Amino acid sequence: MSSRWLNFHEKMIKQRMEKKVDSRYFRDGAVKKPYSAKTLSNKKSSASFGIRRELPSTSHLVQYRGTHTCTRQGRLRELRIRCVARKFLYLWIRMTFGRVFPSKARFYYEQRLLRKVFEEWKEEWWVFHHEWKLCVRADCHYRYYLYNLMFQTWKTYVRQQQEMRNKYTRAEVHDAKQKMRQAWKSWLIYVVVRRTKLQMQTTALEFRQRSILRVWWSMWRQQLGQVRVSRALHASAVKHRALSLQLQAWSQWREQLLYVQKEKQKVVSAVKHHRHWQKQRFLKAWLEYLQVRRVKRQQNEMAERFHHVSVLQIHFCDWQQAWEQRQSLYAYHAQVEKLARKMALRRTFTHWKHYMLLCAEEAAQCEMAEEHHRHSQLYFCFRALKDNVTHAHLQQIRRNLAHRQHGVTLLHRFWNLWQSQIEEKKEREQLPLLHAAWDHYRIALLCKCIKLWLQYTQKRRYKQRLQARADGHFQQRTLPAAFHTWKRLWRWRQQDNVLNARATRFHRETLEKQVFSIWRQKTFQHQENRLAERMAILHAERQLLHRSWFTWHQQAAARHQEQEWQTAACAHHRHGRLKKAFCLWRESAQGLRAERTGRVRAAEFHVAQLLRRAWSQWRECLAVRGAERRKLMRADRHHQQRVRHRALQAWVTYQGRVRSILQEVAARESQHNRQLLRGALRRWKENTMARVDEAKKTFQASAHYRRTICSKVLVQWREAVSVQIYYRQQEDSAFWEARKVLDRGCLRTWFQRWRDCSRRSAQQRLQLERAVQHHRRQLLLEGLARWKMHHLECVRKRLLHRQSTQLLAQRLSRTCFRQWRQQLAARRQEQQATVRALWFWAFSLQAKVWATWLAFVLERRRKKARLQRALQAYQGQLLQEGATRLLRFAASMKASRQQLQAQQQVQAAHSLHRAVHRCATLWKQKVLGRGGKPQPLAAVAPSRKVTFEDPLLNCIAAGAGDATVGTKRPQAPLLQGALGCLAAEEPHARELNTAHSARKQPRRPHFLLEPARSQRPQKPKEHGLGMAQPAGPSLTRPFLAEAPTAQVPHSPGPGALSSAPGPKQIPTASTGPELLLLPPSSFMPCGAAAPARASAQPATPRDKPQVPPSLASVPDPHLLLPGDFSATRAGPGLSTTGSLDLEAELEGIQQQLLHYQTTKQNLWSCQRQASSLRRWLELSREEPGPEDQEVEQQVQKELQEVELQIQQLAEELQAQRQPIGTCIARIQALRQALR
């Protein structure tokens, strides 16, 4: 939907611009002269195309030429007609005018006619050029407006998503709070019910104790065990609210205590029994609470100890690793400084040698370039003289120039190949010595590393044994506590996950409903807007067609009259002398044909010989190079295999030993864990059996007690319970019926009703308890005294038990701390020894890595030097080809102009005759007297308009970075006609071009073909034979400049939209894009892995990796980037921590610089866009119209949006300057360190 809407919007704006252009020509009923067929082909509007199709031809000559000039016979026939018409015209002038000199009249008429035609052409050319610029700027502005619109919509969408997420999080938090409140209320009710039940159980036990005094103590113990079992079962529910329960119990206990003290002061005798009963109940609860708190405190202490020990161990390990890394970095920096001092002399020597070679090569190239330039200047001068002397030998001179230029380019290429071969031979002579030195150094380093590694493994085994012992001792104490805590946490998390899943489902359903409703509203509004816009566009098109039809009808009537007068005058001159001119032309054509065929055959034979020699020499050179590369690759592979085999054997032995040690440790750990689990299971079984027995006994006693109590209380309780059950059943039935109908929001009201019911039941229970209180008081008088004594003894025992446990805990903590200190001292000594060994091993390994990296850097610099030479040669070749093509284009333009002048002479013959006749009659009347009235002259035919267009200047303007580069300018039909004539007159050049386009191009490296990623619009390719390549950054810097790429057909760009409604262009001689032939030196591989990389490159241009533009801005070629490391094969010792850190840092710096460059380019493009929009507004305000107000308002809105975007980008650049400065300082520091 979005892509279709954008295409439709672009078409609408383009049609509005075309209406504006057409309204300037048809304003106020004044009809200007229509455009010719060549100018109308450039405008891609449906209205102008319909007008051009309906225009009649001016004369039979134009119609005849338009139908026959596409073939060779048609051109010959046209030439014959021109010659015959010219001869008849001269004879008729002599016969009619007599003593009047026609040369003077013709000279006067030609001057007037040329001045008039030039003024009209200048005016129309200026209008067309100005309107074309406005159209291109409008297209560019509209494209940037669409980009900005899409970005703003995306921004708003992201903000809306963020706001929705915030709302959802708030709703989830609110829902969680509400659920917690409801759960807490239900939990309070549950606690109240539980307390009442416990109170009833205590009363039953007291009654039983009074009846049977011997069983009283046993029953109390059973009840205590039952309470403990129930508390253990409900521990998971009470865990998260323990603190709140503690505070609540303490406050209740304090209030009750104050209340008892007050009652004592008032009535001592009446409150004594009640106070004893209150004390008994609260002391039981308090003792149980103290027991639970003591257990929790012990668990928390154990968990804190375990946490402290684990945190200490983790922080100590982290500190040790950081210290080791710091020591390794210090050693690495010292080694780097030493190696830099050692390699300074080598580097200076290599730089000096490389500089001398470059100077010699540059001097030789400059001399060759000067000689070639002199020869080319002399050749061009001679060619200009020959063109002035005679036009007959023009084609032969062009052929000779092309062949000589081809020979010079071939010699230049083979000279570059020979130089590269000599340089490679010199490098190969020095390679064996370097390889031998590197092998000796690697072997010595490997021996040292192996010795140190053996010592390190022995120490490491001893450390592992000690660590295994310490870990086993540590696990014996902490494993059971950790297991219990993990079990509780797991249960709690399961409940939490279930609640979260329900909440997420509810929020997801609500979100889907809201999004669907919003999307439906937006689609309906979008459809209505599109229908309204289509209706407006159709109405405007109908009005435009009506105006164009009226103007065309008037113009056609006038031209029809002019055509009839011209045909009557030209029919007499055409048919009389046709046979004579044809005979003369046939004799001259036969001689020209014979000369042309001889020249073509000689040129073809010479070119074939040159191609055979060049191909044979190039084949031999490639064969020699391939053999040398294969030998070097075999030697490198053999050396790499030997080194890998040795390293693999050492690594396998080390891994085997490590595996055996780890297996022994794992077996011991598993054995120890099994023993611990078995002991824990045994204890758990014993405890569970004891608890089950106690539960059975308590259940039997409680059952007997209930039977005795229920028999007494059941009569009164049945009536109250039956009434209560009846009310509850009614309320429950009403509640379940309402729950099916109402939503989740009705839960609160239901909860309030349920709370009222619970309050009523609690009030009834309190009434029952008051009735039983009198009976309890009498029972508690005798049991309370005995229970006090027993309670005091229990308190003393508990205090003694606490003191003993505290003393044991202190002794254990002291012993553990002493052992831990001893282990810590031993570990520190072992770590210091390992750090020293690792430091020495890292030092040797870094030396090895530095040597390999240095070799890699040297090889990379050599490759860069070779690529620079190939670039220079390629640039010279491109300049030569551009000069030759420019000359060919100038010659073709000259020939086309001559043909156009001849056509204009034939077409203006009748108008010239009328003018001369008028002058003669006026002169006769003045000399001889007025004999009669002069005949009215026929209307002068409108002169043909010719537009000239220089593609080279357009290409240069496109390369300079104008704002109009984004659109594809169509090629003028005049240029196509000139190129067609050139191809017809030069069959040899046409055959060479077809062979050049059909020939398969050799493989080229990816850095010469891939365009750089940038924010500027890409430049379209220029098609045709006579078009020169764009001069600009692509000639001087082909590595990093933007390569011209053809526009994708299915892309919704303005070029594709503008070419849709207009007529199709006439295809030129070369239909495909013109590929550049690169020299063979640019196809040399960059290293040993070049063939594999070249074969692995994708075939399509979309999947090719693009070179980042930040590489072009790097001032120092000695600083390597991470892409350079990844492009070549990695050595055996490049995987070190220092190099990885350096690569990561350089990648981050590169990303920051790329982001800064992209923002800067976006700011430039927005500024250009704003300037183009301001110019367009100024030009439109100079010539205002009624239809331009809407377009001007839209453009003003777009200009405001672009200015806001410019302000935002400027602020971003201002904020990014400080981090970019830090990145540049870091790069300079790295450069100094590497130097």
Curated annotation (Swiss-Prot):
InterPro entries: CACF_protein (IPR052270). Residues 997-1006 have a biased composition (Basic residues). Disulfide bonds: none annotated. One of its GO terms (molecular function) is phosphatase binding. One of its GO terms (cellular component) is centriole. Residues 994-1120 are annotated as: Disordered. The keyword Repeat applies. Belongs to the SFI1 family. Interacts with CETN2 (via C-terminus). This is Protein SFI1 homolog. It comes from Papio anubis (Olive baboon).
